[in-house]
C-alpha cells in the first residue's frame, strides 16, 4: 500500500503480500478506492523465450510499437538467436525510449521483446489487465515517465521510478464499468478514423478527457 513516509519495497514475502492485499481491499471498501504504487500491483516480466520461437507478428521491438497509443505493427526485424523477454496475453508493453512518443500496446498474443520495451504484468487478481492498460496509457502516466527519464537526446524511462507511479485502484466491478465505457469511446474514435481531421482530433480530445475523468475518484463519505 502507499506509504508516503517510506520508499516502497517491492521484494515482498508472501505474508507481506497478503497483508498488502488486505490493506488495499480495506481501503477500497472504506473509501471506494485505494491509492497504490504501480509496483504494489504489477511487475516487470522476468521470463524468457527463445528467439527461434518468434515471428514478425509475435516479436515486438520499440520500432514497431506505434506512437500515440496506436498499438503495434508487424516487425520488420526478428532476432534469429538468443533469448528475448517473454510477454503474455493481457500484459502491457511500453516503449522505454523517448516516452513522450506514448508507445503502448495491450498484448493480444504471447511473444517476446527486448530491453527497449517494458513488459508490465499484473501480480494481483483484482486488477483487470485492460484497466491497468488504460491507467498506463493516460497522459498523466507519460508525463510522470518523462519527468523521471534519463538522457537528453534519447531519453529512456527509469524502470525503478516507473514502479513508484501512483494511481487510484477501485474495486473490480468499478474497473469493469470504466473499461466498458472507455472501450465504447475507443471504438467510436476508431469508427471515425476515416473522417475529417478536425472531427478526428475533436473525438480524440473528448476520449482523453473522459478517460482521465473516469480514472479519478472521490472518497466515499463515511
Language-model regions: role of each:
Residues 1-222:
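Charged, alpha-helix-forming regions
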